[in-house]
């Protein structure tokens, strides 16, 4: 329990969440309702700290806390379930539905389709007449379902915690998921047979549904960010969802052309820019944004060089826009860009990657910190993912330079290797790394197995090397190269399966049983009124500060430490991070904050 403030001397403090209070003290929701705060009933009520929740709703926190504690005292001696910091109440959250769906579709259809397509490139297995369609169905399913839906689930859970505001407009949250899901499923089952009238109609419908889902998701992300304090990572997320909508529009146009022509595959000159919009525009930029927000804390990175972030956005978005426009110019007109124009997007994208890496300091060693996470097997996945991103940037430059000096343009296998280095090596590995760190926190559980994290790391990197190497190195027969690609798909399937087992075992683990504690015992555990003054220093742990200084939570949240408003994030980070490190991550003026915190501590 957090310490008390003036006006709340009792078991309920400003740091107690509404959910904790309502679940521990049945009937206490009436107190909230008297202050005009509706919808607080039941254990699924708001998880905001009461002090913060009151201020958001323009209610005087001390008056509310006084009434809440008066209510509790009227129930003295009754057994109450304590919500200890390490034992959050079990709850079912929406985030797990899109994440579970993404994993299910990847294992059931996305990766198996890729394996079948690779085998069909080397052997006569009866798919030759629909080989291109299978390749495109596999790629689209992996991008939109496996990665896209996974990101959607993570985003809807973390955005309110990052920003300290609820998702808005909330009514679009469920529709965005179901529209994207319906669209990608229809695309997968219809495209191989879309040269017939019935499947062609389903293919057209899939593109409309995906556009509607992309618009809904982009609206929620932009709406939520727009209602909160601006932070550096916001621009990356906004750019990402903007490119997502552009990709959905491009997909609709391409599908409409396919249906009107009576075919069932998108020509390569139209498919290449669509994939660039999805992989570089939406997925990579969204991961960049989340990386800015969480990796400094996850990996104890050096302070972010925020002055480089604007150049990153300019370089990366300019490179992507130039690539897409030049490729569309070739696809829809007689214009053929020269070697310089073909090479420029690669150089711009690579420069953006370099600038981002320099800004994030992701290739530098972690800072030494006594508050560092002791279990960081996931860190290898994240570090390796950024090694793969550097490889992608280097490969972009190499292929562009070879073309620029008069060599061959990139072949189908080479561009395929480039995409899979990005999709498997960087994007999928980042999903594994961040999810292994975040999902157990979301569920309030400990990760089932650190050893399975190591197995996942090994499998995904073997899969990426096996998928990229044979496509780049012209050795052996074409059939043997495709056999290697099929093997890579099988190893990638195993990586996702191991990841799924580890996460499912984590989420389904039995939560610690709630402790029963009486009001008398609570009061005995409360700190004495007579205490030595608490001095706040740069090395003070945030968890100690919240426990020892009443009102510190509200002050920190008001200064931009909005993740502390969420109990899950507080439990995960506060006991391990110092004020100095927290101010480096956000950033906040440490000296001014220390002055205000010490003044607050002295006043209590």
PLM region spans:
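Short hydrophobic interaction/assembly module
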Residues: 61-65, 69, 73
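Compact, charge-rich alpha-helical regulatory domains located at protein termini
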Residues: 3-64, 527-604
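Long amphipathic N-terminal alpha/beta scaffold segment
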Residues: 72-81, 599-604
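Hydrophobic alpha-helical transmembrane segments of multi-pass integral membrane proteins
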Residues: 75-529
């Amino acid at each position: 329990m957090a310490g008390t403030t003036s006006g709340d001397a009792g078991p309920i403090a400003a740091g107690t969440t509404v959910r904790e209070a309502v679940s521990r003290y049945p009937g206490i929701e009436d107190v909230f309702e008297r202050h005009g705060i509706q919808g607080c009933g039941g254990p699924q009520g708001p998880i905001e700290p009461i002090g913060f929740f009151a201020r958001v709703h323009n209610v005087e926190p001390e008056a509310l806390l006084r009434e809440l504690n008066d209510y509790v005292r009227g129930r003295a001696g009754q057994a109450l379930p304590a919500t200890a910091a390490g034992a959050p109440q079990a709850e079912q959250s929406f985030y797990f539905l899109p994440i579970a769906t993404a994993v299910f579709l990847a294992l059931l259809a996305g990766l198996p389709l890729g394996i079948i397509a690779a085998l069909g490139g080397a052997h006569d297995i009866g798919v030759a007449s629909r080989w291109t369609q299978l390749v495109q169905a596999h790629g689209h399913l992996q991008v939109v379902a496996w990665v896209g839906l996974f990101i959607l689930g993570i985003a809807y859970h973390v955005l309110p915690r990052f920003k300290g505001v609820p998702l808005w407009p909330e009514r679009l949250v469920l529709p965005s998921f179901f529209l994207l899901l319906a669209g990608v499923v229809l695309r997968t089952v219809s495209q191989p047979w879309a040269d017939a009238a019935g499947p062609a109609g389903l293919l057209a419908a899939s593109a409309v549904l995906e556009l509607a889902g992309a618009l809904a998701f982009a609206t929620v992300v932009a709406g939520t960010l727009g209602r909160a304090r601006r932070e550096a990572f916001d621009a990356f997320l906004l750019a990402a969802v903007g490119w997502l909508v552009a990709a959905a529009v491009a997909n609709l146009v391409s599908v409409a052309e396919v249906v009107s022509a009576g075919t069932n595959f998108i020509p390569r000159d139209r498919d290449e820019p669509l994939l660039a919009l999805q992989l570089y525009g939406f997925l990579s930029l969204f991961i960049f944004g989340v990386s800015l927000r969480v990796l400094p804390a996850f990996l104890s990175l050096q302070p972010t060089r925020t002055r480089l972030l604007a150049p990153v956005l300019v370089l990366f978005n300019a490179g992507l826009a130039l690539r897409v426009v030049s490729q569309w110019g070739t696809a829809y007109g007689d214009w053929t860009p020269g070697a310089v124009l073909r090479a420029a997007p690669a150089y711009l994208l690579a420069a953006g990657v370099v600038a981002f890496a320099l800004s994030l300091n992701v290739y530098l060693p972690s800072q030494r910190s006594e508050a560092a996470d002791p279990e960081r097997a996931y860190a290898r996945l994240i570090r390796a993912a950024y090694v793969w991103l550097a490889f992608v940037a280097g490969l972009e430059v190499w292929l562009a330079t070879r073309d620029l000096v008069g060599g061959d343009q990139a072949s189908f296998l080479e561009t395929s290797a480039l995409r899979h280095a990005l999709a498997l090596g960087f994007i999928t590995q980042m999903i594994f790394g961040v999810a292994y760190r975040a999902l157990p926190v979301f569920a309030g559980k400990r990760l089932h197995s650190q050893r399975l994290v190591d197995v996942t790391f090994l499998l995904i990197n073997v899969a990426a090397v096996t998928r990229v190497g044979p496509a780049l190195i012209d050795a052996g027969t074409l059939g043997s190269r495709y056999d290697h690609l099929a093997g890579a798909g099988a190893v990638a399937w195993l990586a996702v399966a191991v990841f799924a087992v580890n996460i499912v075992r984590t989420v389904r683990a039995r939560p610690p049983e709630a402790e029963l504690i009486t009001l008398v015992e609570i009061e005995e555990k409360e700190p004495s009124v007579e205490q030595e003054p608490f001095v706040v220093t740069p090395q003070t742990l945030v968890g100690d500060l919240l426990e020892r200084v009443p009102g510190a939570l509200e002050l920190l949240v008001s200064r931009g430490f909005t993740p502390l408003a969420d109990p899950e994030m507080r439990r995960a980070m506060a006991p391990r991070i110092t004020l100095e490190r927290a101010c480096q991550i956000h950033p906040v003026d440490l000296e001014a904050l220390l002055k205000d915190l010490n003044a607050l501590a002295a006043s209590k």
